[in-house]
């Protein structure tokens, strides 16, 4: 009696398996290799299909940053760049612009277009007005709010789709000496004034709007007043909330025992658990043009822009390598 041998895969089946294992290359049309993410990465967000409008966090306890001195400040490791996919749609934005009014913003150190010295507050006011008016031309349903930050936070202009209403509050501002930075109070105020949208399926259903906070910040390195509460954790994990930062620093290297501006910049970046926000740093003694360039890069819709490490601002592909340092942070 003959014993049947176990069937072995044919050559055609082996070729099909080899082709299926080859990932698509990362190109301009597929900058993140989105269709080729590992099954395990997609499984981490599959449970969101019922829909609570939140993305999974890589490490729930990584953002507990309450502490006394710079020595005890532990910056969490960087979060994965992408944890969830959302529809790339140009839905309305609720943009909350948070402008720092510390005395560092009034120091005339930035080099203006004509070579004279100007301060970061004047440049920030102009670039914010240009940003708001340009976003309004792109989509008149976008809404904007202005929050000023010193020792406390104040909501100056409520959410409005009229750029003139925000700009009327933008220029009559004065700086002050600030002893602390109450980051927790800032996020609590944002939570009180806004409501994050919820969809039944975050991967297929576009949200009615997204909420984006843009913080223009300029202070010596100091540990902010911040402890991660459950409502804040949910806010940061929501796929429709974005926290962009433009950090204007002194550019000098502090002593080893002192906190550096790089520590502060790393801390701001660690708040983004989804890897979807943009962070820029600009030296206070540099050209004012750099600040305008950073704000221009924030014009892109947060649901339609790639991860910051994949962002490219050149017109020709051969220019990518030459400007890589300028295009990514």
UniProtKB/Swiss-Prot annotation:
Phosphothreonine: modified positions: 65
Location of the region described as Disordered in the Swiss-Prot/TrEMBL record: 1-84
InterPro entries referenced in this protein's UniProt entry, alphabetically: BABAM1, vWFA_dom_sf
GO biological process, one term: double-strand break repair
Superkingdom to which the source organism belongs: Eukaryota
Keyword Magnesium attached: no
Database matches in SUPFAM superfamilies: vWA-like (SSF53300)
Record's signal peptide: none
Location of N-acetylmethionine modifications: 1
Residues annotated with Phosphoserine modification: 8, 29, 49, 57, 62, 66
GO CC list: BRCA1-A complex; BRISC complex; cytoplasm; cytosol; nuclear body; nucleoplasm; nucleus
GO molecular function, one term: identical protein binding
Domain remarks: The VWFA-like region is similar to the VWFA domain. Its presence reveals similarities between the structure of the 19S proteasome and the BRCA1-A complexes.
Role of this protein: Component of the BRCA1-A complex, a complex that specifically recognizes 'Lys-63'-linked ubiquitinated histones H2A and H2AX at DNA lesions sites, leading to target the BRCA1-BARD1 heterodimer to sites of DNA damage at double-strand breaks (DSBs). The BRCA1-A complex also possesses deubiquitinase activity that specifically removes 'Lys-63'-linked ubiquitin on histones H2A and H2AX. In the BRCA1-A complex, it is required for the complex integrity and its localization at DSBs.
Quaternary assembly: Component of the ARISC complex, at least composed of UIMC1/RAP80, ABRAXAS1, BRCC3/BRCC36, BABAM2 and BABAM1/NBA1. Component of the BRCA1-A complex, at least composed of BRCA1, BARD1, UIMC1/RAP80, ABRAXAS1, BRCC3/BRCC36, BABAM2 and BABAM1/NBA1. In the BRCA1-A complex, interacts directly with ABRAXAS1 and BABAM2. Component of the BRISC complex, at least composed of ABRAXAS2, BRCC3/BRCC36, BABAM2 and BABAM1/NBA1. Identified in a complex with SHMT2 and the other subunits of the BRISC complex.
Protein name: BRISC and BRCA1-A complex member 1
Lineage: Eukaryota, Metazoa, Chordata, Craniata, Vertebrata
Gene from which the chain derives: BABAM1
């Amino acid at each position: 009696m003959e014993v049947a041998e176990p069937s072995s895969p044919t050559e055609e089946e082996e070729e099909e398996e080899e082709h299926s294992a080859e990932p698509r290359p990362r190109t301009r049309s597929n900058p993140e290799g989105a269709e080729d993410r590992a099954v395990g990465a997609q499984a981490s967000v599959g449970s969101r299909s019922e829909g609570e409008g939140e993305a999974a966090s890589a490490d729930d306890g990584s953002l507990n940053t309450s502490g006394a001195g710079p020595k005890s400040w532990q910056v969490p490791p960087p979060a994965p760049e992408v944890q969830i996919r959302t529809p790339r749609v140009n839905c309305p934005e609720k943009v909350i612009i948070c402008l720092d009014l510390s005395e560092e913003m009034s120091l005339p150190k930035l080099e203006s277009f004509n070579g004279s010295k100007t301060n970061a507050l004047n440049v920030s006011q102009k670039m914010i007005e240009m940003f708001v008016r340009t976003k309004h031309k792109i989509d008149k349903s976008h809404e904007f709010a202005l929050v000023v930050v010193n020792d406390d936070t104040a909501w100056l202009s409520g959410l409005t789709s009229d750029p003139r209403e925000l700009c009327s509050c933008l220029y009559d501002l004065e700086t002050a000496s600030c002893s602390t930075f109450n980051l927790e109070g800032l996020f609590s105020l944002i939570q009180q004034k806004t409501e994050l949208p919820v969809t039944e399926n975050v991967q297929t259903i576009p949200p009615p709007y997204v909420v984006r906070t843009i913080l223009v910040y300029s202070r010596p390195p100091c540990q902010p007043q911040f402890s991660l509460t459950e409502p804040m954790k949910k806010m940061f994990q929501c796929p429709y909330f974005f926290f962009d930062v433009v950090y204007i620093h002194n550019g000098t290297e502090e002593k080893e025992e002192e906190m550096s501006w790089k520590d502060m910049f790393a801390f701001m970046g660690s708040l983004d658990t989804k890897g979807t926000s943009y962070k820029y740093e600009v030296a206070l003694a540099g050209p004012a043009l750099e600040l305008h360039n950073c704000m221009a890069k924030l014009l892109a819709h947060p649901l339609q822009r790639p991860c910051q490490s994949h962002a490219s601002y050149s017109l020709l592909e051969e220019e990518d390598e030459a400007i890589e340092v300028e295009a990514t942070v």
